[in-house]
């Protein structure tokens, strides 16, 4: 990546924005962010107010969860990509934003996602995770297909038939947890562990205190939710028993992965914490946010797109002799484009945080701005990946956007903490599950349109991922 200091053809501007009155303005911004405007509108309004896509902001949750909430936001494609430059941005303890969960959530360790690339442990831990995925790549397709059949499609059909509606979001946690657990735990059934049938629930309880300060659950009156979840961090003691059961289950079940860690010089205890984080944050939370958006966009596009997807999927599988293989899936260009477009519009993790390692110049499309050493910065991905100076009709779901010549635009798909054209490696912060997430997105569409011709949905907006309910499922015509 080019050094920003080399790009001097743009006028230099002071970073616009106003942090306002101490504490009071930050709390007002928090209410606007979570309740009065919503995340998307809040960031757009800041850019519009200050006529700039590089602005000063009070980042939620703010007081009193964090004392360090005066940030500079990058809201366009040009400025956002500086977040990927390891020479400029320090990612130490910034994954969750302006607050960080205590080390007790990870057994006294810091998982690799919380450490910067300069940390000596980063390359070893990231390399371990990447090699673990590589060794299990032959399981991805057959294991996920079985999980979809056992935990998703049968239940979808049953609920639509018996109740006239099927809650897609409610079915996802069991399906995703079962797949991830079996993948990383030598194909063991999570129900045979101390978790029993409550694995997803234990995982959600462990995740809740780590994620809720930056979210809105929309299940309580605003003032009560804000008082309970955005002013103070929830004590670890409330979920300690859930955490202990998760650690016990993965310690006893992920035997091969833990053996691999020891061979690399990584302590089993530290490896367990990284596995738990990988399962909980990278995969479980990420997939349960991604899949509802995927079906929302495909569902809202209507029967015409459904027909095109079904035709492509079924014809390719027929050409492959009925086999669903990686080679076959890679030939489905429309399916691939639909998944990329979903990740462009609604990245599972919309915010990237870090602190400036040194003073540098960052560029928007029309100006340069000085970022001081130590400045806390944030990039809002849904604005960067919907940049109207990069994409035509940037806010629209265009299913074939990345087909044919459109593939050259993949470098502007940024959901994985890196460009889509780049790959996760031990020396970068790109999501280690990047390729797996994309494969699973394609595979769930393949399995769906093998079974069904079309469907209709009911969408209920939530803070980030929508709630998706299937109203009808039309089985595949012969």
From Swiss-Prot:
Per its record, the protein catalyses:
(9S)-hydroperoxy-(10E,12Z)-octadecadienoate = colneleate + H2O; (9S)-hydroperoxy-(10E,12Z,15Z)-octadecatrienoate = colnelenate + H2O
Top-rank taxon of the source lineage equals Eukaryota
Q: Which SUPFAM superfamilies match?
A: Cytochrome P450 (SSF48264)
- Tissue expression notes: Expressed in roots. Detected in stems, but not in flower buds, petioles, cotyledons or leaves.
- Keywords in alphabetical order: Heme, Iron, Lyase, Metal-binding
Residues given in the record as heme binding sites: 431
Family annotation (InterPro entries): Cyt_P450, Cyt_P450_E_grp-IV, Cyt_P450_sf
Q: Could you give a GO molecular-function term held by this entry?
A: iron ion binding
The protein's Enzyme Commission number: 4.2.1.121
Xref: PANTHER family: 9-DIVINYL ETHER SYNTHASE, CYTOCHROME P450 26
Family statement drawn from the similarity comment of this UniProt entry:
Belongs to the cytochrome P450 family. 9-divinyl ether synthase subfamily.
Q: What does this protein do?
A: Involved in the biosynthesis of the anti-fungal toxins colneleate and colnelenate. Can use (9S)-hydroperoxy-(10E,12Z)-octadecadienoate (9-HPOD) and (9S)-hydroperoxy-(10E,12Z,15Z)-octadecatrienoate (9-HPOT) as substrates, but has a very low activity with the corresponding 13-hydroperoxides (13-HPOD and 13-POT).
Q: What is this protein called?
A: Divinyl ether synthase CYP74D1
Q: What species was this sequence derived from?
A: Solanum lycopersicum (Tomato)
Gene of origin?
DES
């Amino acid at each position: 990546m080019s050094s920003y200091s080399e790009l001097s053809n743009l006028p230099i501007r002071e970073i616009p924005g106003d942090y306002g009155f101490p504490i009071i303005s930050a709390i007002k911004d928090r209410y606007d962010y979570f309740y009065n405007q919503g995340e998307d509108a809040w960031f757009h309004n800041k850019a519009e107010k200050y006529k700039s896509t590089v602005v000063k902001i009070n980042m939620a949750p703010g007081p009193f969860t964090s004392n360090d909430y005066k940030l500079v936001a990058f809201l366009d494609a040009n400025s956002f990509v500086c977040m990927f430059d390891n020479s400029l941005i320090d990612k130490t303890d910034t994954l969750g934003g302006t607050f960080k969960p205590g080390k007790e959530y990870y057994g006294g360790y810091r998982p690799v996602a919380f450490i910067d690339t300069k940390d000596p442990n980063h390359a070893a831990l990231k390399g371990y995770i990447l090699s673990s995925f590589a060794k299990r790549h032959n399981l991805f397709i057959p294991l996920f297909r079985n999980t979809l059949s056992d935990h998703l499609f049968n239940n979808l059909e049953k609920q639509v038939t018996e109740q006239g509606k099927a809650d897609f979001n409610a079915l996802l946690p069991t399906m995703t947890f079962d797949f991830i657990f079996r993948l990383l735990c030598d194909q063991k059934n999570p129900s045979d562990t101390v978790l029993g049938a409550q694995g997803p629930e234990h995982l959600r309880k462990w995740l809740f205190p780590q994620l809720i300060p930056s979210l809105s659950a929309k299940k309580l009156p605003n003032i009560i939710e804000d008082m309970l979840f955005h002013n103070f961090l929830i004590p670890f003691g409330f979920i300690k028993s859930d955490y202990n059961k998760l650690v016990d289950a993965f310690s006893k079940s992920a035997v091969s992965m833990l053996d691999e860690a020891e061979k690399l010089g990584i302590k089993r205890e530290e490896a367990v914490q990284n596995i738990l984080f990988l399962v909980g944050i990278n995969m479980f939370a990420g997939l349960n946010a991604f899949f509802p958006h995927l079906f929302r966009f495909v569902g809202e596009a209507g029967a015409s797109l459904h027909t095109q997807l079904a035709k492509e999927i079924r014809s390719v599988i027929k050409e492959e002799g009925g086999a669903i293989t990686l080679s076959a899936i890679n030939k489905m260009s429309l399916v691939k484009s639909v998944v990329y477009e979903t990740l462009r519009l609604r990245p599972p993790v919309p915010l990237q945080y870090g602190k400036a390692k040194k003073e540098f110049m960052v560029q928007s499309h029309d100006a340069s701005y000085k970022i001081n050493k130590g400045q806390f910065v944030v990039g809002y991905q849904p604005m960067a990946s919907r940049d109207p100076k990069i994409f035509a009709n940037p806010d629209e779901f265009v299913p074939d956007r990345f087909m044919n010549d459109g593939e050259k635009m993949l470098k502007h798909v940024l959901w994985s903490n890196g460009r889509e054209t780049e790959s996760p490696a031990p020396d970068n912060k790109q999501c280690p599950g990047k390729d797996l997430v994309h494969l699973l997105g394609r595979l769930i569409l393949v399995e769906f349109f093998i079974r069904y011709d079309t469907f209709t949905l009911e969408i209920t907006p939530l803070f980030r991922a929508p709630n998706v309910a299937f109203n009808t499922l039309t089985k595949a015509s012969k």
